């Protein structure tokens, strides 16, 4: 009897311990077993063009998960068909067929920890495949919702947008504006019974998710496509290593197109073998610009009152300096009597250095900086831009001081060359080039708007005279072979730059380019095209057809009124 009483006493003490002393601890442990945490993903914001067309967006994708300890044969229906006993093997086969998943992978994930409450079966299902999986009615599978990144314009804008990787933003605008685009994840919990089914009304939100902002660009995706196709076709014809094209609105400084070849498709990054294509070369690839820079030197000369379009110079084929350095023009010619206009028209290295020497090295350096050279684009936030830390003085040796006047020994990007021509086209006023308007956050605030303060670089008179001189390049100079654009006066400058090969100096490779504006009497748009290491035509004449095609497309697309008068031409010789 005493033994029975003692045994009852033990049970009573244990019962009190469980129900009173340890009650809160055990309840919490039980709740934790039933309580399932779920991440609520904040949607990453879209990147859109100037018209709202999505360049990058987030779409809903679904992961299918399970609780391995609950995976077992079940009774009922499978996909609407009544089956007495649905085996695990039959269920997984049906799941693989509906989703496109791999049965072996599912089995492996379940077997990895068969007593656990969580394992992935399939990841990244679109809505159609997800609904097919749900229709199967398998009781021990669950959904996990997440956002996936898609790029509707694919390779057309891929070099600009960049892309996302498994560990976040990897390149381009995705990387530069990640802080605004990124959403903030939230969380919630729900309770489920022993059968793994969620208990109705048990969901509790512990942290609200917040969507990312929308990044609005100035890019016109239709024009971007035209530009990309134009340079891709030309680059293949020229057998060029790479190519870029830019289109700029003169009056706003907005870049309407920044195209590259080769391209990257952010929807399938692994297919891109050229890792240099992960960014936009128009912004990241520095090169010696060659003769396009002569337009800036001419503008500086006129602005300082050191020359006029009809100023006279005696121009031999070559010129040797006291320190032993020599320069020459691209093609042999007898000594010529050229005006400043003729020097630009014929792209004479010797001629531009003779007149350019009327400015000090510091003056020329200062003008180049005002035009937007020698520093990263201040209104563009983009990874990989060269630092170009030239300081406040040229620090050039004697030969570079001369060569810089025809674009050798200095570095630029294609967008910086576009900036020079935007300034000249805009009556001498530079507007920092940019292709982002700003990022609108989920609560409606606009952030990351670029600083586009205008700066006068040269007088309106100087800019107009240079524009008029550049028409001679098209009508009778290095672009004379380019088919005219009917009804429009075009002002442009060519560039054929040698490619430095380390300590070996300049070799046989070239970078060819054309930069120009239209209509010349009231420029609205600037177009640049650049080809790196072309093989079938190593002169700027090879770049001319692409420039003409793209400029024609721009003028037609934006319905620019034709020129009302003939081109104003200065004499090129005396």
Please annotate each region the language model reported.
Residues 199-243:
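Conserved, well-ordered alpha-helix/loop/beta-strand core segments that scaffold catalytic motifs
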């Amino acid at each position: 009897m005493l033994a029975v009483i003692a045994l009852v006493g033990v049970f009573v003490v244990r019962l009190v311990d469980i129900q009173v002393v340890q009650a809160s601890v055990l309840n919490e442990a039980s709740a934790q077993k039933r309580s399932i945490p779920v991440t609520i993903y904040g949607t990453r914001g879209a990147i859109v063009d100037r018209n709202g067309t999505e360049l990058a967006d987030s779409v809903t994708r679904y992961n299918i998960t399970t609780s391995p300890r609950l995976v077992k044969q079940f009774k009922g229906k499978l996909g609407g068909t009544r089956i007495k006993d649905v085996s695990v093997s039959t269920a997984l086969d049906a799941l693989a067929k509906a989703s496109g998943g791999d049965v072996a992978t599912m089995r492996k994930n379940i077997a990895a920890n068969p007593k656990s409450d969580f394992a992935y079966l399939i990841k990244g299902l679109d809505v159609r495949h997800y609904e097919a999986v749900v229709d199967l009615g398998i009781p021990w599978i669950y959904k996990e919702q997440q956002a996936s990144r898609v790029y509707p314009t694919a390779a057309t804008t891929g070099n600009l947008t960049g892309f996302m990787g498994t560990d976040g933003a990897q390149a381009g605008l995705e990387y530069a504006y990640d802080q605004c685009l990124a959403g903030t994840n939230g969380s919630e919990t729900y309770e489920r019974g022993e059968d793994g089914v969620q208990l109705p009304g048990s969901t509790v939100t512990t942290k609200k998710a917040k969507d990312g902002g929308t990044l609005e660009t100035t890019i016109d995706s239709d024009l971007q496509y035209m530009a990309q196709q134009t340079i891709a076709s030309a680059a293949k014809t020229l057998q060029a290593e790479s190519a870029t094209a830019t289109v700029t609105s003169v009056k706003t400084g907005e870049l309407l197109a920044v195209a590259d070849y080769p391209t990257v498709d952010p929807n399938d990054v692994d297919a891109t073998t050229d890792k240099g294509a992960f960014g936009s070369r128009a912004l990241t690839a520095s090169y010696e610009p060659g003769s396009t820079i002569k337009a800036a030197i001419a503008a500086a000369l006129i602005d300082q009152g050191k020359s006029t379009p009809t100023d006279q110079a005696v121009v031999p084929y070559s010129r040797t300096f006291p320190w032993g350095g020599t320069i020459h023009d691209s093609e042999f010619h007898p000594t010529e009597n050229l005006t400043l206009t003729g020097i630009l028209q014929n792209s004479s290295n010797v001629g531009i250095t003779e007149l350019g020497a009327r400015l000090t090295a510091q003056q020329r350096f200062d003008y180049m900086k005002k035009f937007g050279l020698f520093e990263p684009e201040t209104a563009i936030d983009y990874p990989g831009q060269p630092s170009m830390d030239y300081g406040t003085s040229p620090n050039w040796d004697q030969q570079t001081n001369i060569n810089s006047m025809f674009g050798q020994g200095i570095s630029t990007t294609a967008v910086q060359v576009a900036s020079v021509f935007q300034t000249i086209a805009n009556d001498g006023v530079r507007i920092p080039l940019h292709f982002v308007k700003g990022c609108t956050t989920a609560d409606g605030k606009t952030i990351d708007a670029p600083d586009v303060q205008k700066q006068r670089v040269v007088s309106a008179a100087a800019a107009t005279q240079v524009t008029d001189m550049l028409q001679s390049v098209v009508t009778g100079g290095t672009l004379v072979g380019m088919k005219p654009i009917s009804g429009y006066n075009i002002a442009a400058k060519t560039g054929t730059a040698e490619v430095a090969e380390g300590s070996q100096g300049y070799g046989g490779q070239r970078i060819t380019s054309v930069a120009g504006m239209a209509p010349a009497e009231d420029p609205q748009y600037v177009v640049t095209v650049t080809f790196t290491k072309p093989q079938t035509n190593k002169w700027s004449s090879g770049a001319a057809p692409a420039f003409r095609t793209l400029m024609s497309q721009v003028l037609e697309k934006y319905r620019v009124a034709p020129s009302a008068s003939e081109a104003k031409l200065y004499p090129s010789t005396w």
